[in-house]
Amino acid sequence: MKKWLCIICGLIYDEAQGWPSDGIAPGTAWEDVPDDWLCPDCLVGKADFEMIDITDDAPIEEVTAVSSVSVGSAVQPNTAQPLPSEVTQPAFSNDPIVIIGSGHSGYQLAVALRSQSATVPITVFTADDGALYSKPALSNALAMNKGGDALQSESALEWESRLNIRVYPHTRVEQIDRANLTLHTSIGKYAYSRLVLATGASPIEIPIEGDRSYVMSVNDLVDYRRFRTQLQDKKRIAILGDGLIGCEFANDLIESGYEVTVIGLGKWPMERLIPHQLGESLQSALTDRGVEWALQDSIARVDAMSESSAVLHLNSGKQIEADLVLSAVGLKPNVSLAELAGLEVGRGIKVNQFGQTSDENIYSLGDCVETDQGWQPYIAPINQMIPSVAKSLLDDITPISLTPTPVIVKTPLLPLTIFPVAPNAQGQWYIEHQGDDLTAGFYSPEGVMLGFALLGRQVQSLRAPWLEQLSFKQTAA
């Protein structure tokens, strides 16, 4: 049986399991899945899936668990070392490959490693419960009437058993002893042969005075469960942040029957990602559905007004009443553990063309990573990096190759696809009407297209030809 990966959101269709909730029985081959079937999480079609695995359904060879060991005291370098220009691999010890983080990148790397080696010992440390879920689905799960249990696909124990690895949930890694290849964790010391930092990214918190108990973020399944609980008996939701995630949540909440106000610093929604005309069109579509806007503004203070509602004091002096504030102002890579270990860090943990950090034994993967093309927060480049990193960890040295992949913004009221322009890129937008839809390309002064945005239902079919126009150099690892 085969497994198919949605390159947009990371959902996996397993032929052995099918998708019974959509009437697709277990054992249904991909070619027999209806052509009009859509990804349950991001609503793209079958064309945006690619095969990632072929299994014969035979159990893998049992792996002998590696026990935690205690070694000498940690010795950390005083400064970060530069990235190696070429990968160097020390000989394997009997200690496991250790992955810190059980999000999409950490889990998928464990899957890739196990698919290539039935015997290599693999250990995963995670600060949460280690449950598997699709993070991109968090911002559109309400409209699909999915609670936390519906989003969870497996518990840590289930995927630990299925992959024949070791998972330590609710365990924090406090320090990396690079000299002795040892982790200091909340449950003791643990040796590794090679280490992968898949520590993810956390919500940015802006300073807000007053009662912050009304303010929350949704960045993982635990957050989402709490969010669903907080939404009970609530009606008026203020979203702080007018970017991609803020707009997705606005669409999701308004379609679920809530009153929504979006507060953001931009002159138009998603100002950093799309040009003015497209932003205005997106704003109009959401406004027509009932979303209200307070742009070029932010929250200065929150004061409780009753047991279940608050008044938001904006920087402009405007006041808004709300029952809950969802903060969606952006993410910051989790780099503190890498910094403490003396690894080279910029906006994210810096890696070379093999996913290797400035320590030859330590790799990094996911939205904590910064390549020579910048921070990589989107799921498509993460998916493209995983196979190469897995091979390099197993001594099959393989450079990462990133190909252009769009970002599908989950705003079904007005579909939007973008290929983000790199920060500080020089150039300008050129916009064209395609009937009621809009297309926009961002071109350098030399006429090279560096990014694009497609707004509207009909132009979504144009993603492939627009991707072909992108500069390969812009997207190479």
Labelled PLM ranges:
Residues 4-22, 81-165, 252-273:
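Beta1-alpha1 glycine-rich phosphate/pyrophosphate-binding loop at the start
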Residues 15-16, 48-51:
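Short, non-ligating residues that shape and space the ligands of small metal-coordination modules
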Residues 21-36:
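Short linker/helix segments within small regulatory modules
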Residues 40-45, 52-94, 98, 157-236, ...:
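FAD-binding core/adjacent interface of flavoenzyme oxidoreductases
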Residues 74, 79, 87, 92-96, ...:
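Mid-to-C-terminal Rossmann-like scaffold of FAD/NAD(P)H-dependent oxidoreductases
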Residues 103-107, 129, 201-203, 222, ...:
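Residue-level detector of alpha-helix initiation sites
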Residues 130, 139, 236, 245-301, ...:
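Rossmann-like dinucleotide-binding cores of NAD(P)H-dependent redox enzymes
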Residues 213-232, 311-313, 318-388:
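FAD-site-proximal beta/loop scaffold in flavoenzymes
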